[in-house]
Amino acid sequence: MLMPKRVKYRKTQRGRMKGNAGRGTSVAFGSFGLKAMEPAWITSRQIEAARIAMTRYMKRDGKVWIRIFPDKPVTQKPAETRMGSGKGSPEFWVAVVKPGRVMFEADGVSKEIATEAFRLAAKKLPIKTKFIIRPDYEG
């Protein structure tokens, strides 16, 4: 699963997701992409599940790029713990995804295979997504 090798601070504030993605909104590496339509925290487990769903369907053909990285730690307190006594320990990592962000890209497969692979990947994610094609793609 994806996570940073080391971080400057173990715990971060939650923050809020305002507006649309400013960068990473167009297909850069492959010919096809999966774009987020809603804001969300995507966990490293969800990213990995989507990646596996795509690569299994594509059967080792083509290449997949993951354009998001989970660099935000999410803390949790143990169950049945009273309030107070500090912030919980980091439990998992999330990528902050805003609307318009391209999360996955693929190349080296036909448009039909890519469409189905991204549909399977989208089922593993907690947000609405959209299949996009590079403007200069000629299939």
Swiss-Prot record:
UniProt-listed PROSITE patterns = RIBOSOMAL_L16_1, RIBOSOMAL_L16_2
The record's section on InterPro entries has: Ribosomal_uL16 (IPR047873), Ribosomal_uL16_bact-type (IPR000114), Ribosomal_uL16_CS (IPR020798), Ribosomal_uL16_dom (IPR016180), Ribosomal_uL16_sf (IPR036920)
What GO molecular functions are on record for this protein? rRNA binding; structural constituent of ribosome; tRNA binding
UniProt keyword terms in alphabetical order: Ribonucleoprotein, Ribosomal protein, RNA-binding, rRNA-binding, tRNA-binding
* A single GO BP: translation
Q: Which Gene3D superfamilies match?
A: Ribosomal protein L10e/L16
One GO cellular component, as annotated? cytosolic large ribosomal subunit
What is the annotated signal peptide range for this record? none
Function of this protein? Binds 23S rRNA and is also seen to make contacts with the A and possibly P site tRNAs.
Return the similarity comment: Belongs to the universal ribosomal protein uL16 family.
Its assembly, as annotated, is: Part of the 50S ribosomal subunit.
> Mind telling me what this protein is named?
Large ribosomal subunit protein uL16
- The organism is Chlorobium chlorochromatii (strain CaD3)
